Amino acid sequence: MRAEDVVRAPSTPLDAPAFPAGPYRFTDREYLNITYRTDPEALRRVVPEPLRVAEPLVRFEVMRMPDVTGLGDYTEAGQLAVVEYEGEPGEYGISIHVDNFPAIASGREIGAFPKKAGRPRLYVDQDTLVGTLDHGTLPVARATMGYKHRPLNTEQAREELTRPTFMLKKLPHYDGSPRICELVRTQIADIVVKGAWSGPARLQLFAHALAPLADLPVLEVVSAAHVLTDLTLGRARVVHDYLA
């Protein structure tokens, strides 16, 4: 294989990369979002400087993605903190748990998404929208919401989903010392909101050493949204280099 072909390959193995080159288009990407108030000191412990915790709010999300170009069919669940960076409001991606290896690999290698393996689900149980996250055989999170009780303004839904997202990109040298340690910013711009609803919601978190979502306890559910979209993820860009 020629050197230029090695450079152009999106990933390894070279003869069958773990994921294809993006961008990736998501059709019928479905969200269950529950925003809740948590303990401010606990939240500050997981949000890195120079980000600032604006309010002690966390968004728990479960995303069902049945049709993603290049990556197929998968589901994600995770937590995002409401933050500010140099006065700009946004969210910080704390953790994302995914049931699809190409989505994990591409998210970590191309972007800075804090992805690891998990077992999330999003489904309708009679009159209830249910989002769950398990790690192995053990429960980590259970979210419930009344199914399509009230229409949600589509512009409000779009605004929530297109907030800037900040993430931490870390990559070591072969000796274990830091090689890349950056704060990056990404934002969804190409999005069509096909439907949006709200309703009563509850969220229960279970303590787990390797999926510590419960370290950010649910003190009060602030809002809930069920949103159906088509979208393309934006590219990440570096906003702060910790090694500079």
Curated annotation (Swiss-Prot):
The lineage of its organism: Bacteria, Bacillati, Actinomycetota, Actinomycetes, Kitasatosporales. It comes from Streptomyces nogalater. Catalyzes the conversion of acetoacetate to acetone and carbon dioxide. It is an enzyme of class 4 (lyase). This is Acetoacetate decarboxylase. Its EC number is 4.1.1.4. The keyword Lyase applies. GO terms for molecular function: acetoacetate decarboxylase activity. It catalyses: acetoacetate + H(+) = acetone + CO2. The keyword Lyase applies. Belongs to the ADC family. Keywords: Decarboxylase, Lyase, Schiff base. It holds the Pfam family ADC. The active site is at K115 (schiff-base intermediate with acetoacetate). The gene is adc. NCBIfam families: PRK02265.1. InterPro entries: Acetoacetate_decarboxylase, Acetoacetate_decarboxylase_bac, ADC_dom_sf. It comes from the Bacteria.
